[in-house]
Amino acid sequence: MAGASTSRKSYGRIFTLLRDHNKWFENSIPLIASENIPSPAVREALISDFGNRYAEGWPGERVYAGCTYIDMVETECMKLAKKLFKAEFADVRPVSGVVANLAIYSAFSDPGDVMIAPSIPAGGHISHGRKEHSGTAGLVHGLEVEFYPFDAKSMTIDVDATKAKIIDLEKAGRTPKIAMFGGSLFLFPHPVKELAEFMKGRGMHINYDGAHVAGLIAGGQFQDPIREGADTMTMSTHKTLFGPQGGLVLGRNEHAEGIKKAMFPGLTSSHHIHHMAAKAVAFTEALEFGKKYAKDVVRNAKALAESLSGLGFKVLGEDGGFTKSHQVAVNVLEYSDGGKIEARLEKANIIVNRQLIPGDIKAGRHYLHPGGIRLGVSEVTRLGMGTGEMAEIAELMKQAVTERGDPKRLASKVKSFRKPFQKVQYCFDKKLPAYEYVKLR
């Protein structure tokens, strides 16, 4: 009986914590660049019975029975993805952006091959990383990873230095098999067009990791990697592309079979069918509302960056206008380190993440206490905020970072600021409040 009592208490506590989390975000300013808020329709798809089913393989070629409606939804999902990104081929099965990248590694390289990618302090993602850093490319697939030369002033890849490095690698018999563009700190477009011909002339497969900027690409507000020369494009589906957590691979028909085999049976069994259905819903929303949303996101990011700079913050990328994406990067070393600033802001219910920035590793700073913070405006934009609100957010951040006033009082200000912004915009159905806890028991 004691065990039953304990389990019952845990049962109740879990749901209490879930409700508390929703209430917290209802009263916070969410600025995590890798997050967004799904529409009520996407949430509805996520709780469908699809989440209880298996559908191994490709539509029409399943290992299991009972997939009639799953196949129809997945076929529609692929059709929508291809339309959204103007792609010949789409595989909607990756359960994350990391799995999407693994599909590329598996399909187009072998362990021991070389890949060139952005380093983490230069904005690269851990899935692009070396084995010694526990990066997916090195640790899981056995790739030897070289890093692009990076221009810290312009916050993008140095084209001429990259060409020189690849020539040196070629002379050493280490021509990269894969060139990876994209990253997790991604302020400006990467030079795909400028490097594509040079890379393809050396037999390199070009992949563009659009995890962060997929929604901006779909909305015509960033760059167009496939038209610029990328062979394939990977992404997650829950950042600027406002769907459920998941991944997606795009490419040309000539790449389809390799990707399909990598995904199944290589990397997935069930591919979380309810998330696939929710992706399909999100793609319809992106096709209908994505252009305006992407434009508003970029406008808001620039407004937030300019407001922070005007308040004395050292915002990275000033020479290029601070940002052309949803992100803003700030060097906070004059106040403290990124970890401590993240904690100060969280006390005020302003949610950001610490960020390694160029120069950190050479200075001996690591991920727990880096020199910067990263901000993203995807979620606050979807809640209906505009450039005026970005100026208010900058002022609230200044108060929190400089510790002017009581954190509890500042959290109360944040709560008042958030009160008018409680519905998801850029979607077909706005009935359910964005963070309302839906009780099914």
Swiss-Prot record:
Keyword Cytoplasm: yes
Site feature location: Plays an important role in substrate specificity: 238
GO MF, any single term: glycine hydroxymethyltransferase activity
Pathway given in the UniProt record: Amino-acid biosynthesis; glycine biosynthesis; glycine from L-serine: step 1/1
Example GO BP: tetrahydrofolate interconversion
Broad class of enzyme this protein falls into: transferase
Pfam families given in the database record: SHMT (PF00464)
Chain positions recorded as (6S)-5,6,7,8-tetrahydrofolate binding sites: 124-126
UniProt-listed CDD domains: SHMT (cd00378)
DNA-binding is among the record's keywords: no
InterPro entries xref list: PyrdxlP-dep_Trfase, PyrdxlP-dep_Trfase_major, PyrdxlP-dep_Trfase_small, Ser_HO-MeTrfase, Ser_HO-MeTrfase-like, SHMT-like_dom
Predominant cellular place of this UniProt entry's protein: cytoplasm
List of residues that carry N6-(pyridoxal phosphate)lysine: 239
Location within or outside the cell: Cytoplasm
Transmembrane segments: none
The protein's required cofactors: pyridoxal 5'-phosphate
EC number(s) stated in the UniProt entry for this protein: 2.1.2.-
PANTHER family in UniProt: SERINE HYDROXYMETHYLTRANSFERASE (PTHR11680), SERINE HYDROXYMETHYLTRANSFERASE 1 (PTHR11680:SF35)
Function: Catalyzes the reversible interconversion of serine and glycine with a modified folate serving as the one-carbon carrier. Also exhibits a pteridine-independent aldolase activity toward beta-hydroxyamino acids, producing glycine and aldehydes, via a retro-aldol mechanism.
HAMAP family, per database record: SHMT
Protein name per the record: Serine hydroxymethyltransferase
Organism in which the protein naturally occurs: Cenarchaeum symbiosum (strain A)
Recorded name of the encoding gene: glyA
